[in-house]
Each structure stands twice: as structure tokens, then as C-alpha cells.
Amino acid sequence: MTSQQIDAEALYQSLVAQLRTRMAGTPAGDWSVAGIVSGGAWIAARLALDLGLREYGIVNVALHRDDYAKKGLHAQAQPTTLPFEVEERRILLVDDVLATGRTIRAAINELFDYGRPAAVELAVLVDRGERQLPIAPDYIGERIALAADESLVLRQEGEGASARFTFTREPKTA
């Protein structure tokens, strides 16, 4: 890894290994995957393929973030799409980077707008450890400390089974 890049593919493979261990012995139909727009949605789509899960959903947190407009994000980016019943389902919630916990809190609120899951487990490629809320991931690619003025940007090349991820460290924008 260079100082500017983090091996997102290696982190993804670590996440897959953890999830395969966790899901061993349970029917794939017991799980539904929901990824947070946009990096989490990319990861969720690939996890669904790699773990043999039937479907995955996309969660848009815009309506539940108190600082969305302040960060320059737009609510209309991509709507929440959950092609499964949330009620009494075991949901694997996926995001690329966990920092303050605010996005995860917003995603859980969005999921509960669709029903009451039996359980929600959280998987992230990177945990920055900058929590402002008591949120903890169940599955982590790696914990990585970044400077306060840095952010990680996930990019996806290709789609489906040929998709590959890369992370780049970039200066944080406002």
C-alpha cells in the first residue's frame, strides 16, 4: 500500500471470509443485504453474488441525516430500494467507511421505516474510529486511522462478478 492508496480488494476479501464464517450453517435465505448509497451499495451488490444471496437492497440515508445538506450531499441521489421484506429479516447493513456513526444511525432509521428487522449486523471495509455515536461494526476489513483533513474515496471498476474496488486518500472537502 502506498501512503495514498489502501488495498480495498484485500479488505473486501477479508470481509467476505468473515461473513462466510458467520453465515456457515445458516440458509442463505435467512439473510438480506442492504448497502448504503453509494459505496455500500456497490459492496452489497458484490457480496450478494460472492455469498450466494438472492437479493440486495440499497439504502439512501438522506432523509435521516441531520447534516446532509451541510455536507453538500443530495437526497435525490438514489432512492431506497429494498426488494425484500424488512419485517423479521436478518439484515446485513453494508458501508464502505465508518467514521462518526451518523450515516449508520440514519441507515438503521431508514430500515425501520420499512419494518422491524429481526436483527441488523454491520459490515464495513474501513473503520476510522472517529465515533460520535455508540455504533460498532460486526465485520471490518480493517481499522485505519486517517488525518482529520483526509477522507477515503471508494471507486468501483467493472460490475457484477468482475467488479473491483479501490480506495484513494483525498483531502476532505468542507
Swiss-Prot record:
Positions of substrate binding: S38, G39, D95, D96, V97, L98, A99, T100, G101, R102, T103, R128
A family per Pfam: Pribosyltran
Keyword vocabulary terms for this entry: Glycosyltransferase, Transcription, Transcription regulation, Transferase
Recorded GO MF terms: uracil phosphoribosyltransferase activity
InterPro entries xrefs: PRibTrfase_dom, PRTase-like, PyrR, PyrR_bifunctional
Coiled coil: none
Cystine connections: none
EC number: 2.4.2.9
Enzyme class of the recorded protein, top EC level: transferase
UniProt motif PRPP-binding: location: 91-103
Signal sequence range: none
Reactions catalysed, as given in the entry: UMP + diphosphate = 5-phospho-alpha-D-ribose 1-diphosphate + uracil
One GO BP annotation of this record: regulation of DNA-templated transcription
PANTHER family for the chain: BIFUNCTIONAL PROTEIN PYRR (PTHR11608:SF0)
Function: Regulates the transcription of the pyrimidine nucleotide (pyr) operon in response to exogenous pyrimidines.
Protein family membership: Belongs to the purine/pyrimidine phosphoribosyltransferase family. PyrR subfamily.
Protein name: Bifunctional protein PyrR
Gene, per the UniProt record: pyrR
